[in-house]
Every structure is written in C-alpha cells, then in structure tokens.
C-alpha cells in the first residue's frame, strides 16, 4: 500500500515538473519572438529615418545647385565689369546661411586699397560655392551617420596639435631668403580655408573652396565668423621710386613689399613699394575654370596653359609622369589610373582589392619604374604593390609596414623602392626579390620620402619638422632643421645637390645638401644649410617638385593654388588657381614642358609650359 502511494506521489511530482517546464519553454519562445519583432521594428525604423535624412540632404543639394547657378551668372558679370575697369578683385566666397564664411585671397591677386580715394571703392561679394551632399551611403554600424573625414585626409598623416592650434591664425604672405636682394609681397592676412567633411564611400564630394586640414582622422573642427563683402578699389597710380642698388620683387600683382632676409633666410623687415597698374592684361591669364597671375617684377619666360582635365570618382591623392613623359599615373580610392598624356585618354585602371569593398582604400602615393614597365603603389592597407603594366597584374606585394604608406619613390637605377609610413620607419626594398634590405627608424611618423637621382641618398621628412638624409647603406649623414611644423613633401634637384621641402608652416625651403659635395661628416653643419625660405602660400604646403633643369620649384597648397618659384633668384614667378579644392600633389614631366596636379576636387590636370613670346 505504501509503495503505491509513493509511486502516485512521484508521478504527481513528475507531472508538475513537466507542466512547469512546458510553461517555461513557452514563455522563452514567446520572449524570443517578441525580441525578434522588436529588433526588426527598430532596424526598420532606423532605415526609414536614414532614408528620410538622405532625401532631405538631396533636396538641399538641388536647391543649393540652383542657387549656385544663379549666383555664378552674377559673379561672372561682376568680374567682367571689374576687368573692364582694370581692377583685380579679391574673391569672396560665402557659404549657405548658418555656415562659416571664408575669404579666399590669392597672393598674386590682392588689390591695393587706396585710402586717398575712398569714392573709387566698389563692394563685391560672391555667393556660396557648390555644396555637394556627402551622405551617399549608409555608414557602417560603428560609424556615425555624419562623416567626419575631410578631403585631404586621404593623403596625409595626423596633424600635430601645434598646427591645429595655429590653423585659425592669419598669415602674411611674402618670400624670405638669404639673398637680401630678394623682396617679397606684403599681403593682408587672410583666414585659412577649410573643406567640409567627406564620406569616402560617397560618389560625390563636397567641393567648397574651403579646404580642411589633411589627416587620417578628424582633427579639426574649424569655426570662423562671417566676413563682410570685400571692398575693391583700383590700384594706385605707380610713383617713381628712388633707384636702389638692390633689385626688388613683388610676388603680388598689385601690391608688394621689400623683405630683407637674415642669415637664416627669415624676415628681417618690410618696406612697402608702389604697385604697378598699367600692365594688368600682361600679368594675368584667365579662363573659365582657372587663372594665372604673373609676377610683374619677373621677366616673362614662359606661360602655362591647361591641356587636359582628368575627372575621377574620388579625391586624387597623387600624380606622377612616366620617365618617357608619355603617361601619367594617378591614385584615388581603390584604384590607380594610367592616362595618355597626349590625348588625355584613360588607358587602364589598376584596381586595389579590398577585403571589404564598401570601405575606402586610397592609393596615397605612386611611382613609375625608370623603364616604364612597372608601377608601384602605396595604400592604406599598409602594403606596397608592384604592378606589371604589360599584364596589369601585381608582381610583388611588399609587406612589413605596420601603418599606412604615405610616400614612396623608385630609385633611378630601377633596383630599389623606398617607402615611408606612419609606423615611424622608412624602408628600402629590393625590386627583384621583394625583400626589405634596410629599415630606418624615426621618432615620429614618416610623411615624405625621396631617393636622390644619383641613388646615393635617401631623404625623409617627418612629423617632427626635421628632414633626415641617409646614405643608402643606412648611415645618417645630415639633419635639416628649420621648419616650424611637419614636413609634408620633399624633392631632390636633378643633380642631387639641392633639396626642396614643403611644410605645414606654409613655407617652402631650399636646402643645400652638404653630403652630396663630399663634405666629411665632421664638417657638416648640424642643422643643415637653408639657402632660402619662400613664403607665399596662405595655407599648408602639401606638395613640391623641382623642374628637370633645376631652375624652377613648384608647390601645391591647401589654399587651392600652385606657385612657381625661381630657384636662382628666389622670386615667385606666378600663381595658378586651377582647382576648387586643396592641391594635394604636383609633378613635372621629364622634359619640363608640362606639369600635373591632383586635387581634392576629384580632378587631375595636365598643364603645358610654353615659351613666352619675345
């Protein structure tokens, strides 16, 4: 009897346990179903919000485009009126209401304001520039829906905090060199220009004439107050100046200054000189999308003209001619392109394969082999690729860098490649074996690198403001100190005796290399020999180049301009405003008859250098 009762109790307990288990299982299933429904509804809601936001941005873009077209007609009309009056006006570009308003002033396009004739002033202003939407893709989950990167970031390493602190300060233009005979322009200070942020995955890029600082992340949140319309006045009637034993130069078309340079090539003083106003037409070449202002103090040796405009789907980070001058290579997002220089036709595209096609992979630096058979590219994935141009396939992948590749160069004998990276190293690679044969360690990230034309020296620019020169055997032979901010570009002269450098301090420096003159290490000056310092850009100098005849230096800047510098006299020969965004890369053709530029406005351009008429 007891056993039957026990069995009954056990059965009841099992039934109760089973019922409780079934209840819990049902509750768990119901909770899971509710969770899935909630997650699905939240995701759908977020997608709808993003789509609505994208539609709003697209509508704003269409409205902005319509306003821009209307204002451009008025601007062109005002420009024609000013040219008829013989006046070169500062260009004032204003962004939409509620945004920053920045003044873009070219150093060769500043009008002298005559205080004695205020009645002759004329106020002009220009409307907002094209503001394209930067939200063409839904960003990854870990990213904000608001892109934070800017156009120039695709090329450049992080910007030091000291530069960020000074980015809002005004900058007086001019030239300083060690030759006291060289004079420079004394231009009014202008507010640095900024680029709105860009979504690298987007098909369209904001093309405001307001370039922001280059960097690999968003280091800058510029703020600027609106500026009133620019008062434009006719230039002063030139007055006869007392003859001087020293020749003078003005880098501005309408105003200039005399700068006495001390031993270090920096400013020592300024004296204003009278501008020249009777040769306006001879000093300026104007086209619909570009213009050139020539320095009236320089003898006209050559003119420049636009040959080809090469459109790209993204920011153009680098440009480079082949050694025979027939081809131009450009680097942009996920691709390197090769163009025919004569026709401007794209011959082919070398696609960079990314593990995630939706993410950006910019080709930051590029170079042809001397024989033209290979093209080497440096990208954000920390790899250097050597492409065989006959097959358009990768021959070698040089791996070893631990951060992005910012700069590289091919040796002139074709045997080696040098590269610089944010991992604080510069490396020398053997082209035949694909092996790293030399590793140079630096305290800060490498931003620029070049190998001398005689293949004996490697110059390295870095974030610590110093340029280091090594022998190819790995011996440090020279340190060039003088820049006040990071060095972003360097270039050797063809005879390897001169090095040109561009920096975030807005200057270009000309260095005399002691090591190439067989000077003993004990006799080399510790800080190097700076022959001249050129100051004319209103913003960061991002790229420099030296002409094949060693006569001219070329610089590209965040201020959207390119300048030619006479390396013999130190004068600014011309300024070219040829892009709507930062000029990130410049280079000369091997014969010196052309040069190329790459910009954040999604364009590369090929320009001709034509002899001036006698």
Swiss-Prot record:
Residues 164-184, 218-228, 241-260 have a biased composition (Polar residues). It is found in: Nucleus. One of its GO terms (biological process) is negative regulation of transcription by RNA polymerase II. InterPro entries: G-protein_beta_WD-40_rep (IPR020472), Tscrpt_rep_Tup1_N (IPR013890), WD40/YVTN_repeat-like_dom_sf (IPR015943), WD40_repeat_CS (IPR019775), WD40_repeat_dom_sf (IPR036322), WD40_rpt (IPR001680). Residues 120-129 have a biased composition (Low complexity). Keywords: Nucleus, Repeat, Repressor, Transcription, Transcription regulation, WD repeat. Belongs to the WD repeat TUP1 family. Transcriptional repressor. This is Transcriptional repressor tup11. It comes from Schizosaccharomyces pombe (strain 972 / ATCC 24843) (Fission yeast).
């Amino acid at each position: 009897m007891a056993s039957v009762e026990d069995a009954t109790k056990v059965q009841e307990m099992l039934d109760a346990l089973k019922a409780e288990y079934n209840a819990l299982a049902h509750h768990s299933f119901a909770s899971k179903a509710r969770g899935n429904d909630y997650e699905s509804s939240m995701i759908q809601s977020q997608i709808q919000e993003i789509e609505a936001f994208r539609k709003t941005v697209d509508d704003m873009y269409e409205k902005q485009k319509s306003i821009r077209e209307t204002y451009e007609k008025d601007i062109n009309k005002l420009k024609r009126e000013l040219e008829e009056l013989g006046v070169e006006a500062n260009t004032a570009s204003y962004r939409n209401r509620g945004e920053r308003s920045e003044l873009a002033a070219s150093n060769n396009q500043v009008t002298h304001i005559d205080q004695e004739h205020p009645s002759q002033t004329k106020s002009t202003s220009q409307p907002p520039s094209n503001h394209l939407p930067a939200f063409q893709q839904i960003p990854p989950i870990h990213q904000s829906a608001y892109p934070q990167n800017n156009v120039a970031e695709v090329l450049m390493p992080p910007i030091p905090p000291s530069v960020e602190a000074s980015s809002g300060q005004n900058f007086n233009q001019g030239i300083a060199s060690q030759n006291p005979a060289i004079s420079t322009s004394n231009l009014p200070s202008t507010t640095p220009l900024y680029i709105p942020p860009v979504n690298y995955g987007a098909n369209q890029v904001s093309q405001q004439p307001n370039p922001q600082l280059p960097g690999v992340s968003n280091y800058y949140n510029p703020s600027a107050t609106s500026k009133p319309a620019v008062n434009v006045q006719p230039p002063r009637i030139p007055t006869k100046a007392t003859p001087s034993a020293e020749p003078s130069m003005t880098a501005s078309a309408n105003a200039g200054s005399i700068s006495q340079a001390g031993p270090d090539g920096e400013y020592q003083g300024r004296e204003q000189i009278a501008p020249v106003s009777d040769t306006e037409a001879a000093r300026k070449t104007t086209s619909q999308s570009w213009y050139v202002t020539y320095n009236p103090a320089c003898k006209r040796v050559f003119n420049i003209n636009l040959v080809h405009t090469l459109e790209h789907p993204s920011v153009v980070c680098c440009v480079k001619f082949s050694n025979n001058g027939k081809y131009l290579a450009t680097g942009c997002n996920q691709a390197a392109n090769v163009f025919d220089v004569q026709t401007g036709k794209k011959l082919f595209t070398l696609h960079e394969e990314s593990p995630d096609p939706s993410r950006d992979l910019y080709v930051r630096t590029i170079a042809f082999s001397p024989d033209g058979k290979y093209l080497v590219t440096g990208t954000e994935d920390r790899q250097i690729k050597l492409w065989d141009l006959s097959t358009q396939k990768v021959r070698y992948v040089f791996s070893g860098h631990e951060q992005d590749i910012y700069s590289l160069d091919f040796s002139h004998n074709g045997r080696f490649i040098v590269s610089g990276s944010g991992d604080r190293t510069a490396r020398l690679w053997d082209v035949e074996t694909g092996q790293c044969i030399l590793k140079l360690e630096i305290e800060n990230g490498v931003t620029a690198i070049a190998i001398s034309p005689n293949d004996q020296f490697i110059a390295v620019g870095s974030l610590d403001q110093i340029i280091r020169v090594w022998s190819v055997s790995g011996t440090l032979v020279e340190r060039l100190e003088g820049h006040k901010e990071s060095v972003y570009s360097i270039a050797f002269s063809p005879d390897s005796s001169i090095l040109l450098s561009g920096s975030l301090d807005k200057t270009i420096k000309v260095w005399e290399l002691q090591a190439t003159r067989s000077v003993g290490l004990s006799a080399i000056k510790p800080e190097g020999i700076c022959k001249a310092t050129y100051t004319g850009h209103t913003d960061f100098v991002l790229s420099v180049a030296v002409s094949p005849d060693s006569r001219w230096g070329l610089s590209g800047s965040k201020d959207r301009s390119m300048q030619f510098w006479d390396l013999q006299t130190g004068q600014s020969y011309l300024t070219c405003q040829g892009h709507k965004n930062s000029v990130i890369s410049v280079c000369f053709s091997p014969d010196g008859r052309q040069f190329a530029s790459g910009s954040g406005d999604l364009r590369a351009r090929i320009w001709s250098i034509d002899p001036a008429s006698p």
